[in-house]
């Protein structure tokens, strides 16, 4: 008899996602569990190959949409010359660089994603954190641990 812990792990993530009010983990784990347990399993390699890039595209659309809706304005050039705006630009550059370290780490050592997910869920459930997900956690892990 061949037993896989993956469905149990996904159910655990679903429960932790519900308890911690982390919809992204709840929905993601539910979709993956349904895919794994049905004929949709044939599409898992496609999700594995393109899911992260599609997710980043959707995230970028979500971040830029306030500009399109008019809820946010592009500031005049003069406003880029204050300390907060300059700091925001440099922090954005730094975080983008970190992401360049974290995404490859997730591809090279996908087992670490499990730990990052568990840590994210615990941080949200018990420490009042925000579910930014494993991507920024992988970025920081890569930075702290020297590209693991």
Curated annotation (Swiss-Prot):
Family statement drawn from the similarity comment of this UniProt entry: Belongs to the UPF0756 family.
The organism's taxonomic lineage, starting at the top: Bacteria, Pseudomonadati, Pseudomonadota, Betaproteobacteria, Neisseriales
Name of the protein: UPF0756 membrane protein NGO_1674
Localization: Cell membrane
Transmembrane segments: 10-32, 50-70, 85-105, 116-136
InterPro entries with a match to the protein in the record: UPF0756_TM
Keyword Hydrolase in record: no
Keyword Membrane assigned: yes
Main location: membrane
Superkingdom of source: Bacteria
Any one GO CC term of the record: plasma membrane
Membrane topology according to the record: Multi-pass membrane protein
Record keywords: Cell membrane, Membrane, Transmembrane, Transmembrane helix
Organism, as annotated: Neisseria gonorrhoeae (strain ATCC 700825 / FA 1090)
């Amino acid at each position: 008899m061949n037993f896989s812990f993956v469905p149990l792990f996904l159910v655990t993530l679903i429960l932790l996602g519900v308890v911690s009010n982390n919809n992204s983990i709840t929905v993601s784990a539910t979709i993956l569990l349904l895919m794994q347990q049905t004929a949709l399993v044939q599409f898992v390699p496609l999700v594995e190959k393109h899911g992260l890039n599609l997710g980043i595209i959707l995230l970028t659309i979500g971040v830029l949409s306030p500009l399109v809706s008019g809820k946010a304005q592009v500031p005049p050039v003069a406003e880029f010359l204050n300390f907060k705006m300059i700091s925001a630009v440099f922090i954005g550059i730094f975080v983008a660089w970190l992401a360049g370290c974290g995404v490859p780490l997730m591809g090279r050592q996908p087992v670490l994603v499990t730990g990052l997910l568990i840590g994210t869920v615990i941080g949200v459930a018990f420490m009042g954190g925000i579910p930014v997900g494993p991507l920024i956690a992988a970025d920081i892990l890569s930075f702290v641990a020297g590209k693991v």
